[in-house]
Regions:
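Short, polar/acidic, helix-capping and beta-turn segments at strand->helix junctions
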Residues: 1-122
Length: 122
């Protein structure tokens, strides 16, 4: 089995693949818990950014894919983002596109977060 590549930096632009609710060992996080999955996605975005020499401060845009989106999910989205922000010590407010989708790559996934970042190169 191969290890997934979570992102790449080309010149000073990093485009991260969609981060999902999996821990560092690939185990599911937050089964059925939307806020917990959002939190894990944001934590994974931060980890992937560090892997390409960046940080959450470098994020230029986020795209969030939510299964069966409805406005009633907004408080849970905010809860998950807030918990991740507190753990990471970051300002999570970034330009964002939120898209409702029918399904994601695996049946337990409720949310996926992609990021584009501009990273200063030494």
């Amino acid at each position: 089995m191969f290890r997934p590549r979570h992102g790449t930096a080309l010149h000073s632009i990093a485009r991260l693949s969609g981060q999902v609710a999996r821990d560092a060992d690939g185990r599911p996080v937050g089964d059925g818990d939307f806020a917990a999955q959002v939190e894990q996605c944001y934590l994974n975005v931060a980890t992937a950014l560090a892997g390409v020499g960046g940080s959450f401060d470098d994020v230029a845009k986020l795209t969030v894919y939510v299964v069966d989106w409805s406005p009633e999910k907004m408080p849970l989205l905010g809860e998950g983002v807030g918990r991740a922000a507190a753990k990471l010590g970051i300002d999570p407010v970034k330009p964002i596109t939120l898209l409702g989708v029918a399904a994601l790559g695996e049946p337990d996934l409720l949310v996926e977060v992609e990021a584009t970042a501009v990273i200063e190169q030494p």
